[in-house]
């Protein structure tokens, strides 16, 4: 079993299930590669509700089915007051942390020892964990 941990951002999860999105094929391929190579895939508990909200705008019943699939392939990371406070502290101390949700995801990825954050948000800031879009990940994987 590969012990490498990858944090999967909510936009990647939405991209997997919404075929109309521009990064759909890259997101599906990236997750397939990661699963085939036995990476541990993680996401945060708050992203599950965000993903459901976005997908339910298209089809509520399918959105629930999609979430069931997500919880079967990704480890869902809970968080509490300490993680929220750490995210706020980072935002107050580093102007590069501009988005509370992204900063919280970074805090969780760091806490869990993730080596990579997979996000299709090109402005996702992480000072010490590599961030790749799914397209970048697929391109890099194919060159290895």
From Swiss-Prot:
Enumerate the InterPro entries for this protein: PIN-like_dom_sf, PIN_dom, VapC_family
User: What is this enzyme's EC?
Assistant: 3.1.-.-
Task: Name the coenzymes or cofactors required.
Answer: Mg(2+)
Q: One GO molecular function term?
A: magnesium ion binding
The reply to whether Transferase figures as a keyword in the UniProt entry is no
Which intervals hold domain PINc?
6-132
| Residue runs in coiled coils | none
Q: Which Gene3D superfamilies match?
A: 5'-nuclease
Keywords, sorted A to Z: Hydrolase, Magnesium, Metal-binding, Nuclease, Plasmid, Toxin-antitoxin system
Instruction: Tell me any Pfam family this protein matches.
Output: PIN
Which positions are annotated as binding Mg(2+)?
9, 102
Protein function: Toxic component of a type II toxin-antitoxin (TA) system. An RNase.
Family that this chain belongs to: Belongs to the PINc/VapC protein family.
Report the protein name in the record: Ribonuclease VapC1
Species this chain originates from: Aquifex aeolicus (strain VF5)
Whichever gene encodes this chain, its name is: vapC1
């Amino acid at each position: 079993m590969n012990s490498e941990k990858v944090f999967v951002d909510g936009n990647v999860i939405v991209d997997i299930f919404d075929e109309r999105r521009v990064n759909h094929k890259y997101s599906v391929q990236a997750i397939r590669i990661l699963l085939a190579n036995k990476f541990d895939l993680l996401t945060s508990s708050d992203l599950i509700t965000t993903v459901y909200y976005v997908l339910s705008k298209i089809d509520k019943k399918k959105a629930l089915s999609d979430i069931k699939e997500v919880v079967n392939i990704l480890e869902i990371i809970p968080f509490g007051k300490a993680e929220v406070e750490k995210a706020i502290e980072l935002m107050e101390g580093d102007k590069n942390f501009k988005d509370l949700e992204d900063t919280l995801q970074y805090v969780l990825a760091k806490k869990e020892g993730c080596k990579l954050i997979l996000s299709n948000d090109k402005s996702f800031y992480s000072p010490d964990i590599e961030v790749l879009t799914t397209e970048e990940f697929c391109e890099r994987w194919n060159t290895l």
